[in-house]
Amino acid sequence: MENSLKSSGKPPAAPKVGMVSLGCPKALVDSEQIITQLRAEGYEISGTYDGADLVVVNTCGFIDEAVQESLDAIGEALAENGKVIVTGCLGAKKSASGSGLIEEVHPKVLAVTGPHAVGEVMQVVHSHLPKPHDPFVDLVPAAGIKLTPRHYAYLKISEGCNHRCSFCIIPSMRGDLVSRPVAEVMLEAENLFKAGVKELLVISQDTSAYGVDVKYRTGFWNGRPLKTRMTELVGALGELAAQYGAWVRLHYVYPYPHVDEIIPMMAQGPLKGHVLPYLDVPFQHAHPDVLKRMKRPANAEKVLERVQRWREICPDLTIRSTFIAGFPGETEAQFETLLDFIREAELDRVGCFAYSPVEGASANELDGALPDDVREARRARFMEVAEEVSAARIERKVGKTLKVLIDEVNEEGGIGRTAADAPEIDGVVYVEPAAKASKRYKVGDFVSVKITGADGHDLWGEV
C-alpha cells in the first residue's frame, strides 16, 4: 500500500510552556529548576500567554499582599491562556473552610502543588502536554536555565526551616530544614562559575543551619572529604570562586556561634575578596520581650558585642538586616529600644515592615494588636533613623577606590555594585562613561571605581 502521508521535512513544533515566577529568590530558584527540566525534555519556554500551550505560575504566600498578588496572577493566566498549573508556597495554604485556597478561588486550574515540587509539576505537565522527545545530553547547559542576568546567580543550599517564629508560616508551607548534599551544591556552583557567573548568592530559609538535619554528615568533593556544614561549605565555595575570580555572597544568615568562623575568611587569607564581607542577618527586633513573643533569640546585648567583634576582625564588613515594627504588644519604650539598637549597631542596609497579620501565624493570637496607623508610623520612624545611619556609613566611602561589578551599561555610563551591595535590595554605583578605550567596560566586568559622591543610598564614581 502506498503511503499518502508525506513528510514536510520539518520536525513538529515543540510544545511551549509559559512561566510566571513570584516571590523571593528561593522561589526564583524553584522556577529556574522547573524551566531547566522543561528545556531538558525539549519543551520551549514562551514569553507570552497566547504563545504558550499551558502556563505554570510559581506563587508566594508569605504575607497577605503576596497572597493577593499570586491569586491575581493565577486569574490573569487563566483569563489569557486557560490552562494553568500552580506551584509554590501558596499551593500549601488552606482556606478558612480547610480546603485548598487556590482551588477555592480558582477551581479551573489544572493542578496545584506546594513549593520545591519540580517532579510533581513535571508530572502534571506531562499529563496535559506530553513531552516531545527524549533530550540530547547537551540540550541544556550544565548550569541550568537561569532567570537572572548571566553574571550572577542564586545558589539554594537547603529547603525549609526548623524555626517556629510566631509571625511566620514558611515552615508550614516549605517544611522542616532539608539540606542539599554538599557535593551536589558544589557541582552546581562549579557549573555556574564555568558558565560565566561572577557572583554567587547563597540562599536558603536559614543558611547558618545548613547540615543540621543530617548531623553535619561528611560528603566528598573532588576526592576530598567535605562536611555538610556552613563553615566548610563557605570555605569550599570561596576556594572555587577564587579559581574563577568571582564573588560569593551570604544571605539569610542566623547569628549562630559558628558564624564567627566565617568572618576571618572575609578579612584575610586567600579567600579575602571572594567570600564577600557581607552578611544578611534577619534580627527582626532588639527588645527581649518582643523577641520572645516573636519566638526569636532574645539577647540584643550579645548581638551588639558580636557585631562589634566582627567589625574588629573585618572592618569592611557590611551587615544587612530586616526588622518588624508594631508587633503585637510592642510598647513605645520597646520600640525606642529598637531605635537605640539601630543607632548603636550602625547597620549598613536595613529594611523594615510594619507588622501585618499573616493567616495561620501564631502571632495572630497574641494580645496587644496595634492600630494600622501606629504600626505604619513606627515603621516610618524606624526607617528615618536607619537611613541616617546608613547614609553616614555610605558617606565614608567617598574618595575610596572600590571594586565594582557592572550590571548595566547605557549611554550615560554604567550601573554596578560593590561588595556591600546585593542585587535588587541594596544600593548601586553609577559609573561615569570610560574616557579611554582601555578603560571601557561591559556587563559582568569587574572594574576599579573611584567614588566621587554619595546620596545616602547610592554611590557615584569614575573608572
Curated annotation (Swiss-Prot):
Cofactor note: Binds 2 [4Fe-4S] clusters. One cluster is coordinated with 3 cysteines and an exchangeable S-adenosyl-L-methionine.
Domain named TRAM: residues: 395-463
Protein's cellular compartments: Cytoplasm
The organism's place on the tree of life at top rank: Bacteria
Assigned GO CC terms: cytosol
Catalysis: reaction(s): L-aspartate(89)-[ribosomal protein uS12]-hydrogen + (sulfur carrier)-SH + AH2 + 2 S-adenosyl-L-methionine = 3-methylsulfanyl-L-aspartate(89)-[ribosomal protein uS12]-hydrogen + (sulfur carrier)-H + 5'-deoxyadenosine + L-methionine + A + S-adenosyl-L-homocysteine + 2 H(+)
Sites where the protein binds [4Fe-4S] cluster 2: 161, 165, 168
Transmembrane segments: none
MTTase N-terminal domain ranges (all copies): 15-130
Any one Gene Ontology BP term: tRNA modification
Keywords from the UniProt entry: 4Fe-4S, Cytoplasm, Iron, Iron-sulfur, Metal-binding, S-adenosyl-L-methionine, Transferase
The Radical SAM core domain, residue ranges: 147-392
Classification via Pfam families: Radical_SAM, TRAM_2, UPF0004
InterPro entries: Elp3/MiaA/NifB-like_rSAM, Methylthiotransferase, Methylthiotransferase_CS, Methylthiotransferase_N, Methylthiotransferase_N_sf, NA-bd_OB-fold, Ribosomal_uS12_MeSTrfase_RimO, rSAM
Enzyme superclass (EC): transferase
NCBIfam families assigned: 30S ribosomal protein S12 methylthiotransferase RimO, MiaB/RimO family radical SAM methylthiotransferase
Function: Catalyzes the methylthiolation of an aspartic acid residue of ribosomal protein uS12.
Protein name: Ribosomal protein uS12 methylthiotransferase RimO
Species lineage: Bacteria, Pseudomonadati, Pseudomonadota, Betaproteobacteria, Burkholderiales
